[in-house]
Amino acid sequence: MIRFSPCGSRRASLRLLLLLAVSNTAMATGTAGTAVDAARLAAAGTETANWIQHGRTQDEQRYSPLSQISGDNVEDLGLAWYLDLGTKRGLEGTPLVVDGVMYFTGEWSKAYAVDARSGKLLWENDLNVDRDRGQYGCCDIVNRGMAMWNGKVYVGTFDGRLVALDAATGEVVWDTLTVDLSRPYTITGAPRVVKGKVLIGNGGAELGVRGYVSAYDAETGEMAWRFYTVPGDPSKPFESPILEKAAVTWDPSGKYWEVGGGGTVWDSMAYDPELDLLYIGVGNGSPWNKWIRSPAGGDNLFLSSIVALRPETGEYVWHYQTTPGDGWDYTATQHMVLADLEIEGQTRKVIMQAPKNGFFYVLDRASGELLSAENYVHVSWAERIDLTTGRPVETDNSYKTSPVYQFPSPMGGHNWQPMCFHPGTGYVYIPARELAMIFRQDETFEYNPKFWNVGMDVMKDLTVPAWLDRELVKKVGAATAQGFLLAWDPVKQEEVWRHNSETPWNSGALCAGEDLVFEGTGRGYLDAYDARTGERLWHYDVQQGVIGSPITYTVDGEQYVSVLVGWGGAFGMSFGFSSNTRESPSTEGRLMTFKLGGDTQLPPVDRPRRLPEPPADTATSEQIDKGNQLYHKYCVYCHGPGGISHPNLADLRYMSAETHQMFDAIVLGGAQRERGMPAFSDTLNAEESAAIHAYLTRVGHRTLKAEQSRDSTWTSVKHWFYGVLAAVADWGVRMIAWFKSAAG
């Protein structure tokens, strides 16, 4: 459904007037993207006023030379305008700005256009995404952005479509399905346009799909080519000769094709017009567990690889695999940056990536040759990368027979949040984290087409007993999950500086001008740093966590910085303990834009109310235990361990009396489908739903008791003691990591 501002009437005459008004607005500020073609995309670096494509330029450096805002005056940055988006889900997008109009996406792949000067809404289109597909989302109902070409903007939708919209009006030009809806595919990544073709990948490898990237004609929506990243059923013809070669790196006894094999291209791409090479990042296996997926071993190409293709045909050129035979969800879908670096006295055309596995890679982007690799965060799965073979020298990291405590966790040393490259400093700025996990074999694994199929017993480590104090869970969890903005020298392969972000789940980075780097934090601030020293120069309270990536642009000669504000995503959904739900209250997601001297004020935040009285706790211990297990199997990925959700999702410890009464209608009947909560009637029965409800009721009573005594001396002492335990836990984690590294 499309809406125009300021009026939503559907009468034809008024609709025509609104269309004319929107078109006139676009013409007044530019051409609404009608002139964006191959030449303009290639020359995007010279258009300092605009942010035409996802990484601003085709090399994905996310650097803007705009310098009106500088280290000398950034402290004068203030809010110019904001736009409430009416959502409390994660906002991961990078806006585009073309000729005075800003385009961006929100939750459920909703598309928006606003006046980049004032924030006035020009149009919005919710694209009618099937809300039932929400059950297939590993990592929230997010979207990371758009692409633009010849008067159209392109959006990949959560339910697997690629949609072209008229940039001036938001009307659908064409709409094509890119996935098999019988499989749990989703799309959250931003498309790219190269040589008149729209490129889009997909996600879903946690549940079980086969990955690929597709190219569509930008004018007609017809598919031009498709490149599968992993082989299919070996008894059937291979789609290309390279897949026949890749198939020998898989063990067919694992019947990987039944689950899917994985290898989704769910985020990063880059393009070099001189070499005419498209680079795609390939994800993890389906299932994660390589001993289930490919029992005899093998590299399992092209999982966790950077692959170079010809953009006109999809022809394979080269690949580099960062994690051969990945068994830990160490994807190589993370942001890739192209640059020319002076290495050993020679200028090398390189591609750089900091994938999940914790190593920073510098490759020759023409050939795929590995030039250097060093760990940018603590790793324990491998000692180093052998520069002769290009392969990791692995430690004893097998969890086939016994659990392994390992760095990084599946959240990675770096996830989808884009890094940026500053050509002035020569440094890359990485939204990094250090977080470990216990990897253990799922001894009872059986493929379930409606649920996660990772082949690891993740639930055992996420399950929180009903009796355990949630404040202790939160403090220990937060203390052992570190996040920071890391300045990295890609030539010397060493850390320059880091700044603690206080949470491991933050925004992408923006490099700007001579000396600035911007990053938003999960604690609810937008920060600016000195790019050379790491000194924080500006610290602005945006009222909730930031995971969207900031951009900068100018209109009428005035520079702005914009960012989408709304916490969520994979970590934000699953690990509510990383944010204090009382001190980080829920607010609606917003688009926020800053300029020098901006004086707009955000409305005050309403603090959460006290916990309502839960219904009577009459369940048996057997019911509570059953509910605990079921909750941590089916509910934990969205609602968090022990019911501790992040601030912007339903915290099930705080259910109202009405929600308690409607529990079965919500869980089994889909009463909250439009808000992203699908019906689980095909997964749970009434008895199981009642057990989950009983467990959450018990948790609610314990939370209420804690709330009622939170101002007491005993509570203060207890929380102090929990803080000490959390510090000890953090120290213990680091000692384990150190000893494991020393032993390796």
For each feature predicted by the language model, list its residue ranges.
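C-terminal capping alpha-helices of c-type cytochrome domains
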Residues: 156, 623, 661, 681-738
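Extracytoplasmic beta-rich repeat domains
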Residues: 83-94, 124-147, 175-190, 228-268, ...
